[in-house]
């Protein structure tokens, strides 16, 4: 790709990998990634950098900014519960051209002020590790993503505000480990419909002997579950799943 400088942009318009919205009180924001990277960052205040650094600092005056990350290669976000930086993130948009690699463990963990997460469906098709990826985030509607290679979702939505989760998300995955869903939705806010969607999809998957955590927080109590959710729970139980939820076990 040939990069042409036009105004504050080195890359041509439209090929952004990730756009972050942040709110900065006046001070430093560190853009965090992991692994080998080579990217351009438009800081949203007229400054542009090209970098191969995993922790790249930038100093702002107080305000709201849109940061745009461009990369032709693998670029793996990794805020990993570093509160000073993760808590500044208010939104994430990931375009269809992004290459997130295979490991998104802790990518946006601790982004407690992230109220919007938008991601192209196929961007996650090669990701295997989603441990703690959206832990403690604040957006309520989870997008439809391709989890066909994923093998672990341990703590993926732990303590998040996720309420609405799409159907069929786990129909096809990689070979799940026995702890693949341990603590995954503890202290979240899943609706009864979302729990139905999750359980039915996991039952469709066919995996056996796995621990699943959908308890705590305001996750819907079994007293509000649908017949389809109850049936899926019972089917998973018969397949050796160890499921913890709010309310008594379905019968």
Which residues does each predicted region cover?
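Extracellular and analogous surface-interaction loops
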Residues: 11-25, 57-62, 81-84
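Short acidic/polar inter-strand loop motif in beta-rich domains
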Residues: 72-80
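Structural signature of tandem-repeat unit edges
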Residues: 67-70, 84-102, 112-128, 137-151, ...
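Short acidic/polar micro-motifs centered on Gly/Asp/Asn
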Residues: 32-63
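Membrane-proximal C-terminal cap and juxtamembrane stalk of leucine-rich repeat ectodomains
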Residues: 196, 207-251
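Periodic small-residue-enriched repeat registers in elongated scaffold domains
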Residues: 107-108, 133-134, 156-157, 184-185
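Short coil/turn motif common to extracellular beta-sandwich-like domains
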Residues: 22-30, 99-102
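Enriched but not universal
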Residues: 1-16, 247-251
């Amino acid at each position: 790709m040939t990069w042409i400088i036009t105004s504050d942009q080195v890359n041509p318009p439209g090929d952004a990998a990730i756009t972050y919205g942040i709110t900065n009180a006046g001070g430093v924001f560190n853009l965090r990634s992991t692994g080998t990277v080579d990217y351009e960052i438009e800081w949203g205040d007229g400054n542009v950098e090209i970098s191969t650094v995993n922790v790249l600092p930038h100093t702002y005056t107080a305000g709201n900014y849109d940061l745009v990350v461009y990369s032709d290669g693998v670029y793996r976000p990794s805020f990993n519960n570093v509160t000073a930086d993760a808590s500044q993130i208010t939104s994430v948009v990931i375009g269809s051209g992004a290459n997130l690699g295979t490991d998104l463990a802790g990518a946006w963990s601790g982004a407690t002020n992230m109220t919007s997460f938008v991601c192209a469906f196929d961007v996650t098709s090669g990701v295997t590790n989603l441990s703690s990826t959206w832990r403690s985030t604040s957006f309520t509607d989870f997008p439809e993503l391709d989890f066909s290679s994923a093998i672990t979702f341990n703590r993926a939505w732990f303590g998040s505000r996720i309420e609405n989760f799409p159907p069929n998300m786990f129909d096809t995955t990689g070979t799940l480990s026995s702890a693949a869903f341990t603590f995954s939705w503890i202290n979240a806010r899943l609706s009864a419909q979302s729990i139905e969607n999750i359980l039915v999809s996991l039952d469709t998957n066919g995996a056996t002997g796995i621990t699943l955590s959908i308890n705590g927080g305001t996750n819907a109590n079994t007293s509000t579950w649908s017949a389809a959710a109850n049936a899926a729970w019972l089917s998973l139980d018969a397949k050796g799943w160890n499921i913890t939820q709010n309310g008594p076990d379905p019968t």
